[in-house]
Structure formats: C-alpha cells, structure tokens
Amino acid sequence: MANYRDRRVGQEIMREVNDILNKRIRDPRVQGITITDVRVTGDLQQATIYYSLLSDLASEQQKAQQGLDKAKGLIRKELGQRLTLYKTPELIFERDESVQYGNHIDELIRKLNQGE
C-alpha cells in the first residue's frame, strides 16, 4: 500500500513529466503522449510512468516507446532540477492498457445494444 509521500511524489512526477514532454522534448515520436499514472516504489528509487497514445497502430506505439526510451535521460535530468529529492528515481515507461480496455468494453456494450 502506497503511503502519502509515495502518492505525492508520483503526482509531482506526473505533472512535471507532462510539462517536460510538452515543452522540452522535440522528438515527433513523443507527440500526442499523455501520462496517465505514475507509481513510485516505497524507497523512491524507481518510478513507473504509464502513458497512453492517441493512435492504435502498433508501429506508432513502438515508435513512441523508442522516443520515450531515448528521451529518458533528459527527462530524468529535468526532473532532478525541478524536484527536491535526494535522488531522482529511475524512470520506467509502460503503455497504459486501461484506455484500450475501456474502448473494448464500450464496443461490446454498443454491440449488445444494437442486438436488442
């Protein structure tokens, strides 16, 4: 169970990473990425950043992951300057599947309603 500090640091990282992606990263592969959640370990050494992408194409998702992996160092450096933490957490980017799962559920409900 995450305590208050973990959640607070996660919220700050989410806000700052969104800002960094919008203003500092000029890589076209990361355009249109939205940070949906950040989970921080108890010792604040790792932060798993979940993101969603507007495109459902596998090639676009792979390019976005490559762009984020390439920009990881710059994002971590910027976070270190913006946050007052003893050590900046290591960043791990993972695609958030919940958005696509929600779309799938909506589609199933729509099909059920059409069948009636």
UniProtKB/Swiss-Prot annotation:
One of several proteins that assist in the late maturation steps of the functional core of the 30S ribosomal subunit. Associates with free 30S ribosomal subunits (but not with 30S subunits that are part of 70S ribosomes or polysomes). Required for efficient processing of 16S rRNA. May interact with the 5'-terminal helix region of 16S rRNA. It is found in: Cytoplasm. This is Ribosome-binding factor A. The keyword Transit peptide does not apply. One of its GO terms (cellular component) is cytosol. PANTHER family: RIBOSOME-BINDING FACTOR A, CHLOROPLASTIC-RELATED. Its main location: cytoplasm. Monomer. Binds 30S ribosomal subunits, but not 50S ribosomal subunits or 70S ribosomes. Belongs to the RbfA family. GO terms for molecular function: ribosomal small subunit binding. Disulfide bonds: none annotated. It comes from the Bacteria. SUPFAM superfamilies: Ribosome-binding factor A, RbfA (SSF89919). Keywords: Cytoplasm, Ribosome biogenesis. HAMAP family: RbfA. GO terms for biological process: maturation of SSU-rRNA. The lineage of its organism: Bacteria, Bacillati, Bacillota, Bacilli, Lactobacillales.
